[in-house]
């Protein structure tokens, strides 16, 4: 039976755990993992050092559900249980709230049910410059999506938090789009092979269709852009660019042909 991705591969690539497991790659950064509510209460105050803004994400979820921008109110020393935080849920329609650190940890408690956990990443200040989604068929980019206004987009300067715009449409581009060629080279030639080695995923077991979202990171001294991995999606990757179907068809055919070949008696194989 052919499927786009084996459940084991989905667990390796398609949960927020991948952000922690690949944190030492070039697309990674200051990323932490909380395996329990107690660990969250104990270590989040350290992560929220004065002036730090963080993004916390539940282990599995989509549509911004369980993704929170968190920052301390004021910079007067380490955060404590009673310290105030500004928090904003990435789910569409959410507004910024102010609550204590203890109240926020209590709100996150359901995310730890079963095998649940939370990932903690540094907030990327260049988020207002948009998010780029790379659509891949196995290890080849088949198109791009660019979303100028995405979840957690800030309010205009001087405006109250409630004026922050809601996410806008994603515009699709072919794999030849000139604006994304530097990113394409990084993804195909460096990052996907490194991820495969790190997670022990051979090319034949990569999903037929998957995507990875990138935000712009700090510029290098040379002015070159860097990119930070925001998420990998392996399940229900749709819609996608109109350039993707030929890649999907070719990859699917190759997998089916290989499955048929393996089922033949050894004497009949060529």
Model-identified regions with their sequence ranges:
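Phosphate-binding site of ATP-dependent enzymes
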Residues: 49-53, 60-65, 69-202, 216-218, ...
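Conserved N-proximal alpha/beta basic substrate-recognition cap immediately N-terminal to
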Residues: 1-47, 62
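C-terminal active-site "lid" helix and adjoining low-complexity regulatory extension at the edge
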Residues: 178, 182, 186, 200-211, ...
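Conserved strand-to-helix beginnings and helix N-cap segments that scaffold or border functional pockets
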Residues: 15-16, 131, 242-246
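Short, glycine/charged-enriched secondary-structure capping and boundary segments
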Residues: 17-19, 69-71, 247
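A structural signal for short, well-ordered beta-strand segments and their strand-loop junctions
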Residues: 2-5, 32-33, 54-57, 69, ...
């Amino acid at each position: 039976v052919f499927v786009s991705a084996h459940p084991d591969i989905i667990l390796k690539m398609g949960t927020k755990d991948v952000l922690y497991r690949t944190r030492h790659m070039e697309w990674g950064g200051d990323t932490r993992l909380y395996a329990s509510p107690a660990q969250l209460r104990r270590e989040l105050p350290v992560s929220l050092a004065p002036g730090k803004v963080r993004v916390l994400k539940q282990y599995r979820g989509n549509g911004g559900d369980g993704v929170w921008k968190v920052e301390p109110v004021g910079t007067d020393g380490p955060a404590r249980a009673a310290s105030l935080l500004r928090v904003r849920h990435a789910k569409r329609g959410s507004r910024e709230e102010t609550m204590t650190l203890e109240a926020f940890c209590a709100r996150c408690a359901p995310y730890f049910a079963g095998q649940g956990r939370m990932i903690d990443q540094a907030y990327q200040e260049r988020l207002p410059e948009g998010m780029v989604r790379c659509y891949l068929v196995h290890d080849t980019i088949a198109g791009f999506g660019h979303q100028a206004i995405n979840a957690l987009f800030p309010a205009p300067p001087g405006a109250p938090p409630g004026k922050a715009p809601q996410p806008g449409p994603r515009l699709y581009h072919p794999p030849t789009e000139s604006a994304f060629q530097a990113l394409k080279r990084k993804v195909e030639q460096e990052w996907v092979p490194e991820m495969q080695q790190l997670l022990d995923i051979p090319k034949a077991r990569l999903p037929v269709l998957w995507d990875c979202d990138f935000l712009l990171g700090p510029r290098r001294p040379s002015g070159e852009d860097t990119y930070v991995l925001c998420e990998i999606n392996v399940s229900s990757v749709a819609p996608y660019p109109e350039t993707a179907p030929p890649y999907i068809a070719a990859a699917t055919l190759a997998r089916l042909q290989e499955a048929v070949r393996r089922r033949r008696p050894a004497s009949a194989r060529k």
